[in-house]
Amino acid sequence: MDKYAVWGNPIAQSRSPQLHRYFAKQTRQNLDYVAILGDEEKFEQQLSDFFAQGAKGCNITAPFKERAFKLAQQHSKRCLSAESCNTLKKLADGTLFADNTDGAGLVSDLQRLNWLKPNQRILILGAGGATKGVLLPLLQAQQNILITNRTFSRAEDLAHKFNHFGTIEALDLEHIPIQTFDLIINATSTGLQGKTIDIDPQILQLASAVYDMQYSKESDTPFIALCKKQGVTKISDGFGMLVGQAAHAFYLWRGVMPEIDPLFSGNEIKI
């Protein structure tokens, strides 16, 4: 049985194992997929041991996406643009191929929600690996991107790096203009610690829609809870993005694209 996993820290909240087992059953693939807690001090050695033991591939989540990118010998174009990876595949020659399916997952979910229209103003909170992975697909979808981050220089660096792909600008977190954004995307990992980014509540109140890349099976994420408190009604967590990126990762590994619509139809048991 082929072995796969998702690496992160924390990782207990991950629904990736259930998703990939669902995909495997649906497509009649013989594989096992587990969640593994990465050690922030020993991650590279852990990952090396994982593949040395015969594993075929894995997903990478916070805080290891940029570190995993550096471990791979080959990269997809979208992965190179992000300098961050969420999917690794062991090739026949033993080398690691890195891909980033986060952007494809986000765009497909925004399309499913009918939230993706040309020339929208999208404010992205955070400038880490999660943001890097989605910028190129959003810019290719003709979105106008504004990035803010607690460390402003990181937002500036990203805006400079991606400005030849489309309209993108960095904003100081403490000086975001009070105006309506078509969509606010939370790409920070603060929710994993039960926290939220410190943002002026008026900005949330004026938002046409809010999307949190994080997700929670049991309750609202801290960011979604904050948005609801501010009266925002058009809200989505990142479960649909998780499903989309997982489907693209599964296709990379197995060569078959699973059907994801049943997961949102109400006719299947939710993952």
UniProtKB/Swiss-Prot annotation:
NADP(+) binds at G126, A127, G128, G129, A130, N149, R150, T151, F152, S153, R154, M213, G238. It catalyses: shikimate + NADP(+) = 3-dehydroshikimate + NADPH + H(+). Pathway: Metabolic intermediate biosynthesis; chorismate biosynthesis; chorismate from D-erythrose 4-phosphate and phosphoenolpyruvate: step 4/7. One of its GO terms (biological process) is shikimate metabolic process. GO terms for cellular component: cytosol. Shikimate binds at S14, R15, S16, T61, N86, D102, Y215. Its EC number is 1.1.1.25. It comes from the Bacteria. InterPro entries: Aminoacid_DH-like_N_sf, NAD(P)-bd_dom_sf, SDH_C, Shikimate_DH, Shikimate_DH-bd_N, Shikimate_DH_fam, Shikm_DH/Glu-tRNA_Rdtase. Belongs to the shikimate dehydrogenase family. This is Shikimate dehydrogenase (NADP(+)). It comes from Histophilus somni (strain 129Pt).
